[in-house]
Amino acid sequence: MYLTDHGIREAIYGNNQRDINQILENIIYIELLRRDYKINVGKIGTKEVDFVAKKGSEKIYVQVSYLLASQETIEREFSVLEKIPDNYPKYVVTMDEFNMSRNGIKHMNIRDFLLKDEYN
C-alpha cells in the first residue's frame, strides 16, 4: 500500500527508521504516478522488480534501496535488472551520494532521480 501523505503513515505507524526502504519506495511511487506512469511490480523468476513504469511507448524499471552498504545489497538490486533482456532504462535509486552505475543500469541518488526532467 502506498500513501500520498507521509504524515498519515507517521500517525498510524509512528516514526520507525527501520521502515526507510518502504518510505523511499512510497516517494518514488508517488513521483511516477505524478508523471502519469502506469506502475506495476515486475517478476524475474523468483526476484522482484520494485517498479515497472509505463507511459505510452516509454518504459522504465526502478529498484529502490536505502543504501548500497554491502556487496549483498548491491547484487540484489542490480542483478534482477541485469536479467531483463530489453533496452529500456533501468535505475537503482538510493540515498547514496556516489555513483555505482554498471552494465547500463543507472545508479542515482533519490534527490537526483526526483529532479530529473525525463527518465528515457
Where are the regions a protein language model picked out?
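A cross-kingdom feature that marks ATP-driven nucleic-acid transaction machinery
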Residues: 1-120
